């Protein structure tokens, strides 16, 4: 026996199982392109640096075989007033938190696997757990966790790498992850109580500590294995991926795009999002799965290629310790190159998510919040708001109409250029403008582009329009609003509702937040 060779083999095996925790170049590249968002706010470089520091420390810990959940945190005063918009007090005594949950998941990269027969499958990569980030705030004796969303911004020459992929259904996977966590919690409690009743967890002497710990760890491994098996059948294609992004993802992408200085030469396009793997060693062997409507078929990548292994997750083969789900993936591409791509087409004229309809919706929201406000607005503008077939407001008061024209000229530049560029109707993918800053690529045909959700957190157009309306018209007063008074007398509303409308409009006019030029 060659003892030296055997020693080297064993040493390499240990190194494979217990990585150094150093971040590899691919992970470093992914981290550099990440943007962190809370609500409608992009967190600064200082917060990003702290979060990356938490990731680096977690990677060292995760180089061991993790069994339990982990929470790493750093005290940090995150932007004065930042959390006010989220309905909480200023976050001056908070913690930035990295939370690892040990619950095996299979996060998809959206890549479609074409099969010669049967349904197409979608690739996904299995990890032992999931990493998310939060702002932790102490209120009295309680803690509140606010989710930090993640977007990745990539400079690309074209959209070709993203035209044959699906979106990860983050919202559905979050629900499944929470349900699995609740099931693990209940199962662990029941099993621990049974073990305690048998005396397996009794600790009365130092020697009992190792025995009790071993029994608990055995219980945890059994429960995690059972939870993994139960997840595989539930994570079918309908729950894992979708041809369009979720509403949460669109909101995150729109927040980032709205705060980016792209200019006329580049466009921000939301594309299918890939999760980021936190590999603790370059020698970690990936475990991939093929997702169809029946669930996930796991495969292990061996020297000769993929090899089916139903028990891969529960084997001793080192697998990816954790993955970071990405809420939105944004490709910044040259605008001029979009029109030359044979794989991209423009949206259908009937699309309900075009930028035209988004702007007209903003106008509608500004004027038609409720019947009382309709009446008051009608008194001011002297004209009734109407819409033409394109969805652009066609009949407005003089001042409002001029303002809207200026707004449309600014916001519609990208949409007009894109409409002229994207003419290939036989393409595989469709680029849909959903706001003045963001478009979404989808494998759906142009006729179904309306399924892409419009950002619901983009109120910049509405705020700016409201501010202009109230600036160019006299203050609203009950004694001058005969229509509002008539509405009250006819019983269609009540006086307090109209007064509330007045207060809202007055505060809007005086609110510095609405005086920003978008």
Curated annotation (Swiss-Prot):
Q: Which cellular component, as a GO term, is one annotated location?
A: virion component
Mind listing the UniProt keywords for this protein, alphabetically? Virion
The primary location reported for this protein is: virion
Protein name as annotated: Uncharacterized protein R553
Instruction: List localization entries.
Output: Virion
Please give the superkingdom of this protein's source: Viruses
Give the originating organism: Acanthamoeba polyphaga mimivirus (APMV)
